[in-house]
Amino acid sequence: MKKQLNPKYDHLQVEKDKYQYWLDKNLFKADINSNKPKFSIILPPPNVTGKLHIGHAWDTSLQDAIIRFKKLTGYDTLFLPGMDHSGISTQVKVEAKLKQQGIDKNKLGREKFLLEAWKWKEEYANIIRKQWAKLGLSLDYSTEKFTLDEDINQIVKEIFVKFYNDQIIYKDKQIVNWDPEQKTAISNVEVIYKETQSKMYYFKYILEDSNEYLTVATTRPETMFADQCLVVNPNDSRYQKYINKKVINPVNKQVIPIISDEYVDIEFGTGVMKCTPAHDLNDYHLGIKHNLKMPICLNIDGSVNQLGGKYQGLDRFVARKKIIKNAIKEDLFVKEEDIINQVGFSERSNAIVEPYLSDQWFVKMDKFKNMVIDLQNSDNKINFYPNRFSDVLNRWMTDAHDWCISRQLWWGHQIPCWYHKKTNEMYVGINPPSDIENWTQDQDVLDTWFSSGLWAFSTLLNNKGLESEYFKNYFPTSVLVTGYDIIFFWVARMIFQTLEYTKQIPFKDVLIHGLVRDESNRKMSKSLGNGIDPMDVINNNGCDSLRLFLLTNSTPGQDIRYSNEKILASWNFINKLWNASRYVFLNLDEDFKFDPNFYKTDLEITNQWILTQLSKTQTYVYEKMNKYEFSLAGNHLWDFVWNKYCSWYIEFSKVNLNNDKFTHQTKQTLFYVLKEILIMLHPLIPFVSEEIYLNMMLKESILLEQWTNLNSNYDTSFIDDVIKMITSIREFRNTKNIKNDVCLSVNISNTNQNHTKLFKKHFDQIYNFLFNFCNTKLVDEAIKNKTSLSIDEYFIEIANDSFINKNELIKELEQKQNYLNNEITRSQKILNNQEFIKKAKPEKIQSEKIKYQNYLDQLQAIKDKLKELTND
């Protein structure tokens, strides 16, 4: 073997054609006939509204890292891709595009509009697939799904009909959140409440046949046309005499009654409220209670309808101004006040949302809320990472209201309900009525989240229902990776819809992540213009650098702060790995062959040391990856590669490669440890790990390798002390400007019992290390004229009067003494904290006790040394 990497790491060259290579080798394809254990992830489908953003890059990198890790650890994996039609969002985009071309959606008609929407979908689906490739996602494209695929559409209809027949879905006229710009109902979670500078308007409602009036405050005068009564509290002595009397509505002169209800807060405002059941949720419930009529005074576009008389056709906010102007003229206006209140805006159009009485389809939530809460309180609960989000889910489900699932859109799953043209009979079914010419289908479509809620299993059925082999093998899916912002939007709905239809949970684990924030810790948004295009980062620094940054900064449930500096640090890490790999390849002979049994020979101590460190790293990384703790796994691996392998073992190997006795085993060790490093790094940095691996001429791909662990446990702990000694002596040379060709004599003093034994046992080896790596002779007798370097509880005494600076040494030791005193205080507080003792794992408590004792030992050694120095 004689392979050489390019002298310089070039991410563009490394990442070029790799993805196609993986696809050509079918390395991402699930093997349904494999006897390996199954592991599956269904990709949360991105919306076909546009390109992927940095949040998608993070979300998908997490999933891909899990899939690659599981593949390397012996699983048959399925990573199923798909996209979401995203009803309202996509329709808004397509409408805007048509508008730019001078085309009106309504004139175009439904069928032709849908053709335009499908063109949009195809265009952006292709863009998204290219972005998936740039991100290196190991997706099985043979299983790709779209939420409007015919087989998915069939499942959606089947479940709608089942839920309807089971009386879970119903149609009713209720108050909904209405987007007057998009002319559709939207769900509660699609309403964004913002603190807004508003006004409160006070009007006179004059009593019938009297000059008296009651003052009523409202923020929405345009809804007064639909007022049905005034309401006062029966216990409010100010207004008891007016109950059952009548007043004249100041905007339309209609006579309406005054009724009483304890719902009215005596202390709020004037204590009199107007009741408009069709335009306010609380008023709606009062209307039902008191059997009030519910006329609607606004059109679906937010303009005033025929109830507004002379105001008919005016936009609601234009009408508001005119109503106030005319009320002033008629002396029916009292005053206006500036207020700050919470106003609901549509998440998609940013229009102010209207509470609006409308015929809609709903899902009953009573059964489902109990279903989810009971599940999460059982032994079969879905595991949330971190666990606190299971409680968040339970709280949201406790407060859940019936879910409005109909949308007044064209793009989406049209509701499978037909109305008879003559009798208005309603028919709900998977297939249309046989005499279709006599029926008209419901024009509404389903809320996008209804079909998305079926995603975990509908993607696996392939027109074969629950008998599908994919469903049998890969369901429930292994883990869902998603953001905390859509736990109720999506996660909860997937759980209860899946449970209701399949009687199984949709996934075993849920890994929750946060948001990607900018470098100033602000949420990324179009309005701030602070978004990051992941494709730009990939072009400039490589996909591996982006993924390494995202994954090594990923803590379950937490936000991540984007950092150009950390992206560059990731690139530098990969560059160091590249250069280390070049060093390995340059030192291998033409006829080098890897011997998988090389470690069974009598290995030199540094080869033993790196294999022991490797084994510890493999164990740690494996454990943390299985718990989705990517930051801990990645940073531990980073430290091992950078510090132990590149910085120290490669340096040790240079000596061994010049010793015929150790040359062969050192080459084998260099090669083997590099291979294992690449396998561990592959889930994080797939492109460069594959490139280096292919140069090792082993298998067709690193994805065909197996995550292993030699369980090496050689007695090499003294090497860690050697490294500390070498580092301290080198730092001492640099600080004192002592050239490397000046040989230093040193002695080790103040060792505790363990170190005394250890250093005695390995004296000759330590001598050789210090001599070879920092031109230092280790002597076994005390040195009188010396400079002392503190390492843990012991000292390195350097014999050379010209280097002594007693005052500086005392100062350094006093600083370390202060540091240790602080650490001892901190450790004491922790160990005296009963909550910590009660909740912490035993190994965590033991670790803190060991630290505490080490601090005490080090402090005593420094005190003794300071005493010795001050007595000289």
UniProtKB/Swiss-Prot annotation:
Monomer. Belongs to the class-I aminoacyl-tRNA synthetase family. ValS type 1 subfamily. The gene is valS. PANTHER family: VALINE--TRNA LIGASE, CHLOROPLASTIC_MITOCHONDRIAL 2, VALYL-TRNA SYNTHETASES. It comes from Mycoplasma mycoides subsp. mycoides SC (strain CCUG 32753 / NCTC 10114 / PG1). ValRS has two distinct active sites: one for aminoacylation and one for editing. The misactivated threonine is translocated from the active site to the editing site. The C-terminal coiled-coil domain is crucial for aminoacylation activity. One of its GO terms (biological process) is valyl-tRNA aminoacylation. Catalyzes the attachment of valine to tRNA(Val). As ValRS can inadvertently accommodate and process structurally similar amino acids such as threonine, to avoid such errors, it has a 'posttransfer' editing activity that hydrolyzes mischarged Thr-tRNA(Val) in a tRNA-dependent manner. This is Valine--tRNA ligase.
